[in-house]
């Protein structure tokens, strides 16, 4: 199975990429640092540095979108929150546009984001329909 991961060299993405390749998946990582993909994610991972490298005839059964500005490296000022938000929204829109041009559409798109959007709600199970909080 072919899997495309955006943000595959990040905190979550690198662990996921290693796990998937160990299970035999054919993984391609979109990263700002394509030369570092093998070092960070392990051998056998394909690397792209731009969505424009995706061709309409490329086929991926699964696309996992984890890309975005890091959340651990700076205080969350209003300006930083805007960077975090914009980096995720912009890339997601571009990714969906690329998917629309694909001859064979992926069977599954998984798009991750920070749980901070929902705030700390204890042991409550959170879904897309959950009420957001002003924590972020």
Segments the model singles out, each with a brief description of its role:
Residues 93-135:
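Conserved Rossmann-fold NAD(P)-dependent oxidoreductase catalytic core, especially the SDR/UDP-sugar
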Residues 27:
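Short beta-strand element of Class I
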Residues 30-34:
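N-terminal Rossmann-fold cofactor-binding loop
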Residues 6, 60-66, 110-112:
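Rossmann-fold scaffold of SDR-type NAD(P)-dependent oxidoreductases
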């Amino acid at each position: 199975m072919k899997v495309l991961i955006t943000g595959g060299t990040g905190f979550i993405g690198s662990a996921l990429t290693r796990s998937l390749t160990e299970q035999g998946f054919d993984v391609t990582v979109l990263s700002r640092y394509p030369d570092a993909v093998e070092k960070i994610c392990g051998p056998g991972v394909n690397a792209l540095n731009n969505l424009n490298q995706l061709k309409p005839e490329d086929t991926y059964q699964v696309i996992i979108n984890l890309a975005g500005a890091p959340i651990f490296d700076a205080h969350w000022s209003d300006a930083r929150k805007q960077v975090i938000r914009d980096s995720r929204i912009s890339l997601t829109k571009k990714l969906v546009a690329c998917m629309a041009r694909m001859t064979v559409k992926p069977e599954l798109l998984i798009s991750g984001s920070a749980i901070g959007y929902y705030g700390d709600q204890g042991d409550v199970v959170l879904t897309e329909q959950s009420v957001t909080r002003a924590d972020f």
